[in-house]
Curated annotation (Swiss-Prot):
GO terms for molecular function: peptidase activity; serine-type endopeptidase activity. This is Mitochondrial inner membrane protease subunit 2. InterPro entries: IMP2 (IPR037730), LexA/Signal_pep-like_sf (IPR036286), Pept_S26A_signal_pept_1 (IPR000223), Pept_S26A_signal_pept_1_CS (IPR019758), Peptidase_S26 (IPR019533). The keyword Zinc does not apply. NCBIfam families: sigpep_I_bact.
């Protein structure tokens, strides 16, 4: 009887040690390095959710890649919605600070992206709530860079940072 209590106590201690090490490591990893997210809606079709409401892609979000707020034109990023801070949205970076972009339905036909901001759009222009609705987005709202589609298995692929040719900035802020 004493041996079984001793064995149970050792198992419990081992579990607790593992638990109290694994949980902080997992939380730190998910907060600072990477996590997964389900993409809802049609705003990023055909890149994400090409099947519409019948399926939802699950993507890998890399936090580490945007830790210094460094993004490139064409990157698909997750960001805090400028209109609803409780919500995260996934969009494509179209323009960076200093770029001049031709808008689609924005109050100004041309917009120069201010310092510390980016212009983001969904790939499905008629069905996207993006910078054409709310203007340039602060880099401070950047959450992660979407790097891979993980689900469904038949769509597993790396997400390329490709800027649609018709959405290239008219003038870039690069020197």
């Amino acid at each position: 009887m004493a041996q079984s209590q001793s064995w149970a106590r050792r198992c419990f201690k081992a579990f607790c040690k593992g638990f109290f090490v694994a949980v902080p490591v997992a939380v730190t990893f998910l907060d600072r390095v990477a996590c997964v997210a389900r993409v809802e809606g049609s705003s990023m079709q055909p890149s994400l959710n090409p099947g519409g409401s019948q399926s939802s892609d699950v993507v890998l979000l890399n936090h580490w890649k945007v830790r210094n707020f460094e993004v490139q034109r064409g990157d698909i990023v997750s960001l805090v919605s400028p209109k609803n801070p409780e919500q995260k949205i996934i969009k494509r970076v179209i323009a960076l600070e200093g770029d001049i972009v031709r808008t689609i339905g924005h109050k100004n036909r041309l917009v120069k992206v201010p310092r510390g901001h980016m212009w983001v759009e969904g790939d499905h222009h008629g069905h996207s709530f993006d910078s054409n609705s709310f203007g340039p987005v602060s880099l401070g709202l950047l959450h992660a860079h979407a790097t891979h589609i993980l689900w469904p298995p038949e769509r597993w692929q790396r997400l390329e940072s490709v800027l649609p040719p018709e959405r290239c900035p008219l003038q870039t802020g690069e020197k």
